[in-house]
A protein has these predicted regions:
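Short alpha-helical segments that sit at the start of domains
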Residues: 3-36
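Short amphipathic alpha-helical interaction segments
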Residues: 57-74, 80
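Short, amphipathic alpha-helical interaction segments positioned at domain boundaries
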Residues: 93-120
Length: 120
């Protein structure tokens, strides 16, 4: 599955969900980016370096590795297959598809806000 991850759009979507009080999952930019990178490499091993390529500007050193252990592995979203290598699980794919839906919802909401703003 090949697609580009729009980091700026994901940040805007995360900010939107945080404004609604949702700070985990859809409101967490690190979570969003990690899951989308893993999903992008579905069926292949995703290297830690692939994830860091997207998350470095949003994460402190060590926080991504910690999140991989405490959230992604613990919840069964990924399986660690080697040092620094992960494969997304079916549960992870479902979570990634949910995130894509949240991004689409954000875009539709933003578009509607823009239309309403222009109404006299």
């Amino acid at each position: 599955m090949t697609y580009e991850i729009d980091v700026e759009m994901e940040q805007k979507a995360a900010d939107f969900y945080q404004s609604l009080g949702i700070n985990q999952g859809p409101g967490d930019i690190q979570y969003r980016l990690i899951l989308l990178v893993l999903n992008k490499n579905e069926g292949e091993v995703t290297e830690f370096a692939d994830i860091r390529e997207y998350t470095d500007r949003f994460a402190d050193k060590g926080s991504i590795g910690s999140k991989m252990k405490t959230v992604f592995q613990l919840e069964g979203l990924v399986e660690k297959v080697k040092r620094g290598g992960y494969i997304i699980t079916d549960k992870g794919i479902i979570a990634a598809n949910f995130l894509k839906d949240t991004t689409d919802f954000y875009k539709k909401t933003k578009r509607m806000e823009d239309i309403i703003e222009r109404m006299p």
